[in-house]
Amino acid sequence: MGQKVHPHGIRLGIVKPWNSTWFANTQDFADNLDGDFKVRQFLNKELANASVSRITIERPAKSIRVTIHTARPGIVIGKKGEDVEKLRNAVAAIAGVPAQINIAEVKKPELDAKLVAGSIASQLERRVMFRRAMKKAVQNAMRLGAKGIKVEVSGRLGGAEIARSEWYREGRVPLHTLRADIDYNTSEAHTTYGVIGVKVWIFKGEILGGMAAIAQQPEQQPATPKKAPRGKGRK
């Protein structure tokens, strides 16, 4: 009882696109799938501090095209594009085919579930009170135009002997409405008391017209290589 289906999985092909877009023969499918997993694993490890939201992979004509959605494109690109060139070579070695890497900037990280969950987890690791971290995330999301947001944390909250769950919600989060644009993600905070799980649901509004309406929306422009300013950037 009380189990929830994954908000992205139930909406795939309705209002949510796939993170990997390619077709393969039966004998190549497993290799491509394993390659996608290894590429994402490598990029998430290398770009742990770059606020990466999601990684989309396409495989056109015996090559691989990776799009990294990040709130801090300057860190990914590096000085004069040096870092992104290293990533391109590494991805090509992992996938075994020529690689192309595009960088897409996340304009509003406060409305991205993965970045919000990661921010809350990092605050918990820095011993910020969990209620303060949750409330701040909710207020920022609502201020920037979210229709609703729910945040849940589970574990030994505040160092308590018995683990428990607490959640905070503001606005609407209609999980059963398939046309609702629900962004969902999780993160983990590794504290001295143990692991605290963080879940975030963000309702951004309803999408009428399904995938056709999403395809007509203007895509985010790839970020141009430029040097990241010192002492600035989102943490």
Curated annotation (Swiss-Prot):
Alphabetic keyword roster: Ribonucleoprotein, Ribosomal protein, RNA-binding, rRNA-binding
GO biological process, one term: translation
SMART domains per record: KH
Region annotation (Disordered) ranges: 215-235
Pfam family, one: KH_2
Recorded GO CC terms: cytosolic small ribosomal subunit
Residues of the signal peptide: none
Domain KH type-2: 39-107
Molecular function per GO: mRNA binding; rRNA binding; structural constituent of ribosome
Keyword Ribosomal protein: yes
Similarity section: Belongs to the universal ribosomal protein uS3 family.
The protein's role, per its UniProt record: Binds the lower part of the 30S subunit head. Binds mRNA in the 70S ribosome, positioning it for translation.
Protein name: Small ribosomal subunit protein uS3
Top-level taxonomy: Bacteria, Pseudomonadati, Pseudomonadota, Gammaproteobacteria, Pasteurellales
